Each structure stands twice: as structure tokens, then as C-alpha cells.
Design a protein with these regions (language model features):
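Nucleotidyltransferase catalytic core that binds NTPs
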Residues: 1-200
């Protein structure tokens, strides 16, 4: 099978994540995407995060009706820090008959030299989603450089609106509507658990 790996804190998961994953599945004909909620992402160790069980609940409620999306517990099962290089290797060794594609944003790709074992990551199947920003020239230039020794880099337009988890948290904090930005089940969880009122 062709399987995408999409990690994130998903705090909360939102319609932008869903549109992106659907777009990736359609463009690369993936059989499945493993959604990988992070317990301790190495680039966000100092950031406040909603409790993992609540983030998982929001992800599950959002993706449960899509058979091509599946939560995988690798990045949170042991509460350890998992680097991308280790994550990709784990799936390749555990499922040797499957082909894996790591999904990342343009900002992450442009800063990939800061990642552990980044040269090895650049040899893998990478799906990069771009935003409509002033970074597009730098992004295309970098992709062309990497493609000299790895042809398996795919650039996908992010057709979703400019939605982020930060935007949603700020709207909640300001007591503004997030309807249509997340699904109704996520809205209910946020209200019931009084999430994001403490973000600053």
C-alpha cells in the first residue's frame, strides 16, 4: 500500500488538515494516511499543549467517517521525543511491503537543515504542501536542488483557506465563533472541556 504519514499536535485538528489530507490522497493516489498526533514534538517542547487524550478525542471525532484516515499511536505511545527520521524508519521496518510518504509544510521543508538526520530524510518520499506566500520562489528553488538526488519529492497546493490551530485557539479565547473551521464534535469538546481559554 501507499501510505502517507502526517504528524502534528492537532491542537485542535481543523478543516484545513482534512482538506489537505484529502488533496494529498487524490493527487498521489494514496491508500491511507496515518495521522500521528504528537506527544512531545521536538520543535514544540516549551509550548503549552492540550492534554493528549483530548487532542486524540478531537482527531478521532473528525476522521472517524473517512476509511482512508487512521490514527496511529507511534508518536505518543511511550511519551518519548520522536524525531521524523526515527518515525519514518520505524514504519519502513515495521511494514516493509508498504511505501511511505512523509507529509510536511513548506516552512518545515525550508528549515529542514535544523532537523535530526535531515540528509537522510531528504532521501525519502516527501510530500510538501505549499501556501500562497512570498516564500514560493525559495521553496521551488530548494525543491529543485533536492530533486537532483531525490526525484520522489512531490509539491502539493494547499487548497484550504489560511486556517491554523493558532487561529482557532485565539478565536476561542476571544469568544468568537469557530463554526465551519472545525467539525461540530470538536466544537462540543472545546466547550465541554473549556479548552483554549488559557492560551496566550
Amino acid at each position: 500500500m501507499k501510505i502517507g504519514l502526517f504528524g502534528g499536535t492537532f491542537d485542535p485538528i481543523h478543516i484545513g488538515h482534512m482538506i489537505l489530507m484529502e488533496n494529498v490522497i487524490n493527487n498521489l493516489d494514496l491508500d491511507k494516511i496515518y495521522v500521528l498526533p504528537n506527544s512531545n514534538p521536538p520543535h514544540k517542547l516549551e509550548n503549552k499543549k492540550t492534554a493528549l487524550n483530548l487532542r486524540l478525542k478531537m482527531v478521532n471525532e473528525t476522521i472517524k467517517d473517512n476509511p482512508k484516515l487512521e490514527i496511529n499511536d507511534y508518536d505518543y505511545r511511550d511519551n518519548e521525543i520522536h524525531y521524523t527520521f526515527d518515525t519514518i524508519n520505524y514504519f519502513k521496518k515495521t511494514y516493509p511491503n508498504d511505501e511511505f510518504f512523509f507529509i510536511m509544510g513548506e516552512d518545515s521543508f525550508l528549515d529542514i537543515e535544523k532537523w535530526k538526520n535531515y540528509k537522510e530524510i531528504l532521501k525519502e518520499n516527501l510530500i510538501i504542501f505549499k501556501r500562497y506566500s512570498n516564500k514560493n520562489f525559495s521553496l521551488i528553488s530548494k525543491i529543485n536542488q533536492v530533486r537532483k538526488y531525490n526525484k520522489n519529492i512531490y509539491l502539493i497546493d494547499n487548497i484550504a483557506l489560511d486556517i491554523s490551530s493558532t487561529l482557532i485557539r485565539n478565536l476561542v479565547k476571544e469568544n468568537k465563533s469557530i463554526r465551519y473551521l472545525v467539525n461540530d464534535e470538536v466544537i462540543n469538546i472545546i466547550k465541554e472541556e473549556k479548552l483554549y481559554v488559557w492560551f496566550f
